[in-house]
Amino acid sequence: MRALIALLAGVLVGCANTPTPPLALASQVDLKRFMGDWYVIANIPTFIEKGAHNAVETYRLAADGTIETTFRYRADAFDGEEKQYTARGFVREGTANAVWGMQFIWPFEADYRIAWLAPDYSQAVIGREQRDYVWIMARTPRIPEADYRRILEFLLRQGYDVTRIQKVPQRWS
């Protein structure tokens, strides 16, 4: 009986320590095509993004090869206070430009991974290996519901808790 209990305990411990497979990555990212404005369609928000409306992330390739990033949104309502944050992205070598270190405060860099990218660069999913945050982004403020559902299915397969994903209100005139 003790041997059976020890065996079961070992199996349970082994299951608890099963590593999460690596997050999928876009196979190749053309940085010049990726640059520009991206509307945040949905996310698992960071503390600064909670209540964001009309959220847009803008990327610009700097002369030194880093990526100047500006995130702007309206706080808590479409007519709320406009907020803006900047960061700098550092592309990791050997990742087909899909993995960046995103620096909001020197010298710290946050994990930033282009997990999925539409072939026409119209939609993208940005994730983190920890699966704690995710951003569904598009070149337009809205995407078809079928596309949104497919992206949620992709994220579920990647190990995300999709019940935490919230749509970001977008209204542009």
What residue spans do the PLM features occupy?
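A beta-rich soluble binding module of mature secreted/lumenal proteins
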Residues: 15-173
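Sec-dependent N-terminal signal peptides
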Residues: 3-12
